[in-house]
Amino acid sequence: MERYRITPPQPAFGCGACLPLADRQTMDVHIHVIVGRLCADLRVLIDGFPVMHTLEAEEICRRAFQLPRLIREDVRFSAGGIACHEYYFRYLMADEEEHLPGDRVSEVLRRSFGSADSFFYIFREEAKRMQTGGFLWLCTESRSHVTRLRLASTRGYDLPPAPYLPLLSLDLWEHAYINRFGEDRRAYADAFLRRLNWDAVDATLTARECGG
């Protein structure tokens, strides 16, 4: 059995290009250098705490308060960074065809934002508005009896606070977009939304409605 569950995200397409969102070099640096370093740092930090070795990065981040005060913030930073990136890479598809939400997800977006088109617009504008060095999140609400989606923004590698449950994230650190999009974060956000596996997003929403 592996000692740690801390590994860089593994997109469905490996580390190849995800055009027009990111070229191969950007993806390779993003996964192996940026996230790889976070994984290496976290393994060192939790080495003496076996109870943490089998946990996912998100759970380690949320349970960092159980660790000695001296390393808590470093653990939150490294574990949070890994978790943020897992939500970024989770639904990305490598083919260059445009992907749009299906009927069911479009209905949830309509209920939450007015329409799927309105959601795309709001998401792009929020990405433009945010300063670099954080994440833009699409979340569900744990206290809502009807599935509703909300946007949340976080600085650094922080995760959204309760009652928000992360669904996916947009990385707004410069390493994710600067090479292909410069400062045009609206275009970057649009490219991201059109490379998502919306059927997989739908499956996650269904699982949450069923208590999964």
Short names for language-model regions:
Residues M1-G212:
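Feature for soluble, non-membrane regions of globular proteins
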